[in-house]
């Protein structure tokens, strides 16, 4: 879920909200976002529809696609700084796609240098325990001790199954509250569209590094609400409403 949200948020902020976005893909060795960018470029090359769509988008917003800087947790900040210097780049926001565990080498170093962490949650005991443990350690060891630049760590519900009993979510919400962690109000429903990548065979667009999601696809996805909330807590310019 992390990589998908990184891409969706980056694409909406960059292509629709007019912000200058950079993405650092430091979730090695899988580098899901870098690989997605490669597949996106391939899909555009194979599809006249996507070629026209990309041309029209460029004509309209007059900016190139956001960079995906391939790195690892140890070198992420250094690689970002090098890119900024070499390309003379200016960003309003930089998103980091990190491994989901503090045991990965360099993760603590990188999260110490960033401003906010957002963690998608799933109502599954194993996922919840690891997510909450991650959040609590960061909160206690870094934020509370002022050992970092971090201004906040926020959790949000992902893959919310309407059939799941509300008591399950309510009991986890109490655990989150007791741990004094911040939970966003936005809830992302469990929907197959989050798995849909750009394809030369289909004309609908949802998850892509080159385009924002289609308006038809975004309805009912919970993304608009999530991004408005992200912009509010991070004080990003949210004047370009969705």
Annotate each predicted stretch with a short phrase:
Residues 23-24, 96, 119, 155-157:
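Structural beta-sheet core signal
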Residues 1:
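Conserved glycine(s) of the Walker
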Residues 105-125:
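Inter-motif core of Ras-like GTPase G domains
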Residues 131-147:
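Conserved C-terminal guanine-recognition region of P-loop GTPase G domains, centered on the G4
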Residues 32-33, 115, 134, 188:
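Generic structural signal for small/hydrophobic residues in well-ordered secondary structure
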Residues 4, 9-93:
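P-loop/Walker-type NTP enzyme "switch/lid" segment
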Residues 159-208:
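Beta-strand-loop-alpha "switch" segments that mediate conformational coupling across diverse proteins
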């Amino acid at each position: 879920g992390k990589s998908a949200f990184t891409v969706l948020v980056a694409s909406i902020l960059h292509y629709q909200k007019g912000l200058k976005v950079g993405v650092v893909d430091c979730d090695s060795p899988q580098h899901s976002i870098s690989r997605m960018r490669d597949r996106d470029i391939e899909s555009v090359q194979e599809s006249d529809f996507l070629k026209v769509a990309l041309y029209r988008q460029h004509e309209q917003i007059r900016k190139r696609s956001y960079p995906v800087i391939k790195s690892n947790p140890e070198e992420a900040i250094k690689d970002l700084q090098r890119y900024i210097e070499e390309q003379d780049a200016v960003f309003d926001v930089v998103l980091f796609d990190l491994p989901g565990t503090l045991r990965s080498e360099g993760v603590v170093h990188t999260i110490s240098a960033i401003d906010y962490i957002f963690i998608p949650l799933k109502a599954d005991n194993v996922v919840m325990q690891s997510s909450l443990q991650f959040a609590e350690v960061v909160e206690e060891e870094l934020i509370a001790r002022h050992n970092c630049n971090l201004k906040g760590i926020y959790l949000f519900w992902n893959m919310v199954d309407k059939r799941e009993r509300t008591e399950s979510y309510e009991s986890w919400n109490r655990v989150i509250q007791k741990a004094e962690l911040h939970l966003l109000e936005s809830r992302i429903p469990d929907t197959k569209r989050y798995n849909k990548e750009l394809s030369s065979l289909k004309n609908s667009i949802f998850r892509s590094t080159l385009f924002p999601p289609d308006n038809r696809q975004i309805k009912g996805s919970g993304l608009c609400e999530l991004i408005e909330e992200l912009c509010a807590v991070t004080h990003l310019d949210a004047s370009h409403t969705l």
